[in-house]
C-alpha cells in the first residue's frame, strides 16, 4: 500500500513548516475510484493540481520540513474538521461521488482511522519538533468551476492565528504584483 502521507525533512533548523492537504489524486484500489471515471480523477475535484510540486520546491528553497497528503480529497478531505459534512464529499463541482453516498458509519470510521488521523498526527509530530512554528498550507484553485463564475484573484491568504505575520507576508507578495483576496 502507498504511504498515507509523505514527510519532507528539514535541511536546516527553521521554524517554517509547509504542507499540502490536497496534493494527491490517488485513491487506493479497494475503493474502485469511488465510482468515478479517470477523467474525473484528473480534474481539480480530486486534488489541488500542482501543489505537490509547490510544497516540495518551497521546502527545498527554504530548507524546511513539510508534509504531503497521499490520498485524494474525494476519499477523505484532510482539510476538513471531522464534524464537517464535506469530510467525505458526495458531490464536487456537479460530479456525484457514487461510492461516498450512503457510506456506513463503519466505512466512515475506517477512512478516518486509516487516513485522517495518521495524517494529522504526522503534522502534529512535525510541529511539536519546531519552536514557534510558522505554518503554510498550500492549495491551488481552478480559475473557473464547471458550476461557477471566474475567480478574479491570483492567491488567497487565510489566517488562523497570526494576523501580523500574515499581513507582512501579504505585503511582501504584493511587491511581486500578486493580487490577493
What kind of region is each of these model predictions?
Residues 1-135, 140-181:
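N-terminal catalytic or cofactor-binding beta/alpha core of small enzyme domains
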Amino acid at each position: 500500500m502507498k504511504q498515507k502521507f509523505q514527510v519532507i525533512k528539514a535541511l536546516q533548523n527553521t521554524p517554517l513548516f509547509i504542507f499540502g492537504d490536497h496534493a494527491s489524486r490517488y485513491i487506493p484500489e479497494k475503493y474502485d475510484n469511488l465510482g468515478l471515471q479517470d477523467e474525473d480523477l484528473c480534474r481539480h475535484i480530486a486534488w489541488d493540481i500542482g501543489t505537490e510540486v509547490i510544497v516540495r520546491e518551497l521546502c527545498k528553497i527554504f530548507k524546511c520540513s513539510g508534509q504531503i497528503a497521499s490520498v485524494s480529497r474525494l476519499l477523505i478531505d484532510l482539510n476538513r474538521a471531522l464534524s464537517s459534512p464535506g469530510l467525505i464529499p458526495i458531490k464536487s463541482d456537479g460530479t456525484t461521488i457514487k461510492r461516498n453516498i450512503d457510506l456506513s458509519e463503519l466505512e466512515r470510521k475506517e477512512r478516518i482511522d486509516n487516513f485522517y488521523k495518521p495524517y494529522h498526527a504526522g503534522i502534529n509530530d512535525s510541529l511539536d519538533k519546531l519552536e514557534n512554528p510558522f505554518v503554510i498550507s498550500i492549495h491551488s484553485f481552478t480559475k473557473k468551476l464547471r458550476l461557477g463564475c471566474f475567480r478574479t484573484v491570483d492567491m488567497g491568504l487565510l489566517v488562523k492565528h497570526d494576523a501580523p505575520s500574515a499581513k507582512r507576508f501579504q505585503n511582501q507578495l504584493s511587491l511581486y504584483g500578486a493580487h490577493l483576496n
